[in-house]
Amino acid sequence: MQFPEGFIKKYEEILGDEARAFLASFDDEAVSAFRINPLKERQLSFSDAIPNTPWGYYGKVSGKSPEHVTGLVYSQEPAAQMVAQVAQPIPGMKVLDLAAAPGGKSTQLASYLAGDGLLVSNEISSKRSKILVENMERFGATNVVVTNESAERLAKVFKGYFDLIVLDAPCSGEGMFRKQPDAMDYWSVDYPSQCASLQREILADAVTMLADGGRLVYSTCTWAPEENEEIVQWLLDSYDFELIPIQHINGMVPGIDLPETARMYPHHFKGEGQF
């Protein structure tokens, strides 16, 4: 895979001796995986389970297969499955998935809620919100409301309401380069900083929707520190937050200057990229 020169230089500086293995990992095939839907099926079992996950398996499921069409399984990349697993809501919670389409994290959050509590799955894009609705309906989650709003408009309605907010933020998408090579066309040295400005705007609205004692889980599918550790540090500096350490499993490594956070690289883990 051919990378922009600025990308290579950046990750040689960040990863040092690991940079060669990191860049070489992009020549491998993207990893496919899926989850069993515990709301519908508890008897299905497959080989090649993703370690340390309750419902995840490596492998590809056809969109035309009976298991997919009936919502018994949901296709989701392995690293992406870690976000809702870190969030892990308990039944009865009021949960917001703020950038939810196409529905991977929302279906997983709904699995943890097990029909008890409320999940608001929001997607600002009208087109993508329709896909989100289809996936949530197929999954069979009954305690979910799908909204098609900006974070700013939601914040006017849900001030101090949610026990848990998950934001898998719009980002530069570096972690998806292997799966979606076209995403590299949008990348530039300045692009992560541009994304970070939007991320701060969304987070400022998210903070107002958290109930007292609530939790905010922030994630991206990129490795750019501008969009990850620097955003977390901005939250800590700007608001009354306490950073909860993440258990580093499945090849996770500590974040840059924030060891409580976690990074996932394809040369450490059988999956794509995630923060």
Question: Where on the chain are the PLM-derived regions?
Answer:
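S-adenosylmethionine
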Residues: 1-275
